[in-house]
């Protein structure tokens, strides 16, 4: 009997030791997992975002959105591209949260509010937001299934190249933080730039979505590197666009609840919705200058840039539609990039060819600008670049495009209708 009791006691002791070892192992395992998760969290991340669980298991379940999934928010909604995005979404029946800096600025928002009175299936609601303020988009993004980020507070005209670069990161980080806090966003489509794509190549080289501005460093004589960001605005702007693209893709991958897709437009032209869209130094602005009889690159008899260039043109309405299709298409995935440029060679013109086309489309305008000519030929040879086409957007997103003739004609007609010529 005593031996039996001793065996029972021995078995219980062994069991307790086993349980203690198992508990110690489980505790160590969870501690290791916790430490691993903490190491992945980015420095300076908001406290409320630190505790938010990653859902990478959702990655295979993510697909495009539809209007039944909820509203779509548009940043930079009053801008040239953003306004067309809002219009396109409303045509498709979406409820749009239009984010603008000042909802009381009638000059910038009236054309948006007028969309509510055009019999479109969708609707629009304005939200006041500022890219440079943390949390400014939280309210606008609540309940949204998609975000189309067209807003940009910085460009070439900041005081220093470093401000261009740093500012681009700051504003995009604020927007991404609001996306994560919303918790309902499936697709985040944002306007990048062809500047994030282009780099020195031989004349006639055709750029694709596989190209990045940091490629072919030797072609820049080693200048186009991150070490030179603080010294050159062009480098700062292009590298900011490329590196924020990569930052956004990484943020979406780590979060696991939404996918990020970029649209990289080249020379965007097309009809203006408001005279506010005649933005100084924009491509549509220079079309207006040509129609006023000024050679390309000139403004009020001042030469702002060289008059020779290969124009690679895309309609602003096609750019807008590509943003919306990026939120919907099952073919687009996190990290997908889509160049929005000419559909084919017809949309690529040297300045003198563009002048000839405008003369054909607007015979009533006596003097149309172009570039300096000698005996009917361009005085200077133009470097044959950038060549690129929106083939991938057509193939994967199902984008259909305007003809270059329709785009140019309707651009000029809008300038006339708005009394800008």
How should these model regions be labeled?
Residues 316, 377-399:
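Conserved C-terminal active-site "lid" loop/helix of NAD(P)H-dependent oxidoreductases
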Residues 288-338:
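Alpha-helical substrate-binding/gating segment
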Residues 254-258, 270-287, 326-338:
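Glycine/proline-rich active-site loop of Rossmann-fold NAD(P)-dependent oxidoreductases
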Residues 83, 103-170:
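NAD(P)H-binding glycine-rich loop region in Rossmannoid oxidoreductase-like domains
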Residues 192, 244-272:
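Conserved beta-loop-beta element that borders a ligand/cofactor-binding pocket
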Residues 66-94:
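N-terminal Rossmann NAD(P)H-binding glycine-rich loop of SDR-like oxidoreductase domains
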């Amino acid at each position: 009997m005593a031996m039996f009791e001793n065996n029972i006691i021995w078995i219980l002791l062994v069991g307790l030791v086993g349980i203690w070892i198992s508990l110690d192992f489980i505790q160590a395992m969870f501690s290791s997992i916790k430490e691993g998760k903490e190491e992945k969290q980015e420095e300076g991340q908001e406290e409320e975002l630190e505790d938010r669980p990653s859902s990478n298991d959702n990655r295979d379940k993510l697909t495009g959105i539809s209007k039944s999934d909820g509203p779509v928010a548009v940043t930079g909604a009053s801008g040239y591209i953003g306004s067309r995005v809002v219009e396109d979404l409303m045509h498709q029946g979406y409820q749009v949260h239009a984010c603008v800096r000042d909802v009381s600025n009638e000059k910038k928002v009236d054309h948006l509010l007028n969309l509510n009175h055009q019999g479109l299936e969708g609707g629009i609601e304005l939200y006041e937001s500022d890219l440079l303020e943390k949390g400014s988009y939280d309210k606008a993004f609540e309940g949204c299934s998609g975000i189309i980020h067209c807003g940009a507070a910085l460009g070439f005209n900041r005081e220093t190249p470093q401000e261009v670069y740093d500012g681009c990161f700051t504003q995009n980080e604020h927007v991404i933080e609001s996306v994560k806090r919303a918790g309902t966003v499936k697709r985040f489509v944002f306007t990048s730039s062809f500047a994030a794509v282009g780099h020195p190549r031989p004349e006639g080289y055709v750029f694709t979505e596989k190209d990045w501005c940091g490629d072919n460093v030797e072609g820049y004589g080693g200048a186009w590197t991150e070490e030179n960001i603080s010294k050159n605005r062009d480098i700062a702007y292009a590298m900011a666009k490329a590196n924020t693209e990569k930052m956004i893709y990484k943020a979406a991958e780590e979060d696991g609840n939404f996918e990020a897709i970029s649209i990289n437009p080249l020379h965007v032209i097309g009809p203006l919705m408001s005279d506010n869209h005649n933005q100084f130094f924009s491509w549509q602005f220079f079309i207006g200058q040509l129609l006023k009889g000024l050679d390309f690159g000139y403004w009020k008899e001042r030469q702002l840039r060289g008059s020779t260039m290969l124009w690679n043109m895309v309609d602003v309405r096609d750019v807008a539609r590509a943003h919306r299709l990026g939120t919907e298409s099952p073919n687009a995935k996190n990290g997908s990039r889509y160049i929005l440029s000419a559909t084919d060679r017809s949309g690529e013109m040297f300045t003198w060819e563009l002048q000839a086309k405008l003369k054909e489309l607007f015979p009533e305008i006596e003097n149309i600008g172009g570039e300096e000519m000698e005996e009917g030929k361009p005085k200077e040879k133009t470097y044959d670049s950038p060549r690129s086409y929106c083939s991938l957007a057509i193939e994967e997103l199902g984008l259909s495009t305007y003809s270059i003739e329709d785009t140019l004609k309707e651009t000029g007609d809008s300038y006339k209708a708005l009394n800008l010529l």
